Amino acid sequence: MSKTHTGRGQRELRKTRRRFLQSIGVAGTVGVAGCAGSNKEAAVDDAGASTASDDDTTGGDSTTQTTESVEMTDRTFATATTNVPKDMQFNPYGQKYPDRAALALFENLLYVNEATSTFMPGVLSEWEIGDELVTLSVRDGYHWHSGEAVTADDVAFKLKLDIHDGATLSNIVDPEDVSVVDDSTLELGLKRPVAEEVFLYSLKPIALDTPPAEFQEFLDAYEADGEAPGLTEKTLDEPNGTGPFKFVHARNQELLSERFADHPDADNVNFAGMRWDYLQSNQKQWTALRSGNVDGIDNVFTPDNIAQSYGDDIQEIPMPANWGLGIMFNHEHEHYSQQKVKQAIQYVIDREKLARTAGSKMHVPVEVPCGLPGNFDDSYKDWLGDSLSEFNKYEPSTEKAAALLEEAGFSKQDGTWVDADGKTLEFPFKIPSGWNDWTAGGQSVVQDLNEFGIEASLNPSQSYWGDIYGNQEYVVAGLGWPDGKLYPYFSLNKLLNGFRSRGILKFPRSVEVPPLGEPNGETQTVELEPELEELAGLTGEAAKKKTQELAWIVNQHLPMAPLMEKIDQSWLTTDDWNTVTEEDVSAIVDWPQYYLPREGKLTAKPE
């Protein structure tokens, strides 16, 4: 049975934190000219109480925080949101749901430390995962903000609704197999055995944010007809939450919440509330942090020159994103449905130059395009093992790229690559507008391709998300290639079998693959869905071997072209706030501003 704690020693966790920081070359803090410490607030677009580390201290001006009770203050923690607060809606299945503020207003079922892949309790205190049945225990002491106690019925309700709605959990649990044992226990029947990491990561995005009184009609509709018309259109201006902060109001420029005294971790929170100021651009958030108008920001890309303008009271917390820029190919396109064309693109792009251009402090190039995250600390190599040397690294080579295009029937005319019918090989690279690092990186990609003779353009788009997920109007586009989780199943499933692969990339459901390490060997047909289903249930050496086989498929077929990985940058000020030191791994949970108060590791200093 998985318990509240994982048994990892604090020294081991500090080593993990140091290894992560060393891998990105960040000291953990950068300096500024001093003020911060206002009571203004603001956010941006997946446990049990952790004990303090051996070198934690309290008192005076120390910024280190323990879980001991602290004096209550009237401070409000200010952070930022890029969403207009008065337009926010608190229906998690609809539009304009404030996913970052929701981390304070609602309680997740569990939390994940992404530096150590450690699962920690939220609403769930314990879990026992068998081959056929999962038993979940609900932590005592949670209440809806309307006053009712949270029970296993509430958790079962949420899980059934999410499964019907197609959440990741629906791949391994049917809604009729969710049952309540008693007020604090529920059981889930599994469709097939799954690895513990696969099951728990499937719970990671789920928060207790659907009070049955508001959503019962939709679960009833699902159970009666298999559909719930109106679920995505339902509006909720005021949430009935379960988190440590309760909604007060949402106005044009701010969302305000107050400390909720009936939360089980309320004794660890010694400040009056949180506020999110509407700051819709990176530049406005940088200015607010520098001027002390906010006390922290959950995640904002910050170039070195901006970070160096900050003072000693602004602390950076690098967060492993397990995510980064890749190229989505539309596999219904006449050119980008061809394996050799995709491979040629991967050869042309200088990934090291790309990472430097995007911001070398927070980006690293993908070393081996195989669908596995972990390029910051080389953890992907642990999964590939001795097979690593067999994979194609796609080191920049215009000669190899040219040979591949020629094999695919392309030729160069007046310096531009054209197909056998004379059609120009174009690369209209669509990216989300306003993403500074991707804009800079995209320019590097386009430059490489144009110099090679592919007609490339960079197209930042305000309608990006609608174009990609709605109209699917794209030829090539930039989007994250990994799934945001270090465990390899999730990124491999995303690339080869999941919704992205099927619905957006239009990647085929079966592929011809040569033996691992023999790219010119005789191919065999591989059906992708059963392969990913098998991987989900494997552990140990069997999981490692299957991971290598599927990573080889990504390496050869490139459903997306993995280019780089990034580190997210989270920020806290320390003039009015006590928080963790850079040695404390407990900050590496999405996101520190919302998780650390639960642990008593982000507290207000006496006024």
Regions found by a protein language model. Name each.
Residues 113, 207-269, 273, 403:
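Gly/Pro-rich hinge or "lid" segments in bacterial periplasmic/extracellular proteins
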Residues 21, 70, 127, 132, ...:
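Extracytoplasmic/peripheral linker and loop segments enriched in polar/acidic and small residues
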Residues 171-224:
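Surface-exposed binding/hinge segments that line
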Residues 233, 256-308, 318, 322, ...:
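Ligand-site clamp/hinge motif
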Residues 339-444, 599-607:
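Append "and occasionally in soluble cytosolic enzymes with long acidic Gly/Pro-rich linkers
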Residues 125-166, 187, 335:
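Aromatic- and charge-enriched surface segment that lines or borders ligand/interaction sites
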Residues 79-129, 240:
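N-terminal lobe/hinge region of extracytoplasmic solute-binding protein
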Residues 1-15:
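N-terminal secretory signal peptides
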